[in-house]
Amino acid sequence: MPRWYLLLLALAGAQRLQEMAVSRRHERQVEGRRAASRSFPLMVGVHVALFTLPPLEVAGLQRRSRAPVLWISLLGAATALRLWSIRSLGRSWNVRAVVPSDLRPVEVGPYRWIRHPNYLAVVVEFLALPVAGGAWLSALLLSALNAIVLLDRIRDEERLLREVPGYKEAFGRKARFIPGIF
């Protein structure tokens, strides 16, 4: 397995761990309602698998990466979108879908155009990170599992967000992931 791929996985994993620390800090700072927690353990499991299955596939099946620069660039763009989303939400962002009681609709950054730019970024990462190393099967399996978990999570999260004053007016006509399409 290429060392650069292990380094890429390590960097992406370290970033996820750092985001968990930020999320915990944000959760301690706010009072709010939490989306149903049933999806969170599944989400954690799928994310752990994102960092374990691809290297096993690459090593076990002796996969070779095709166009790694393209996939790493796509991963970089998705990561930039995710970080922009997190920064735009500020202290409201967390991984457990806790909706602060004083939340107002956030319409800055990528939220000007879509409701869930962070989840869009994660969807792209679930494709790009495995494929960058040549793990096509992992990308397909993990993307499917991630989609199932995200659909449940988004449904629960939007149920809480609809109770936020001004949310329906701000986001009712915005697409979830792709402006004007979906």
Question: PLM features: residue spans?
Answer:
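Cytosolic-biased juxtamembrane loops and peripheral soluble domains of multi-pass membrane proteins
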Residues: 21-38, 63-182
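Long, highly hydrophobic alpha-helical transmembrane signal-anchor segments
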Residues: 37-67
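Physicochemical signature of membrane-embedded alpha-helices that form the seven-helix bundle of GPCRs
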Residues: 8-11, 46, 74, 141
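Feature marks short, highly hydrophobic, charge-poor N-terminal signal-anchor/signal peptide-like helices
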Residues: 1-4
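N-terminal signal-anchor/start-transfer transmembrane helix
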Residues: 9-23
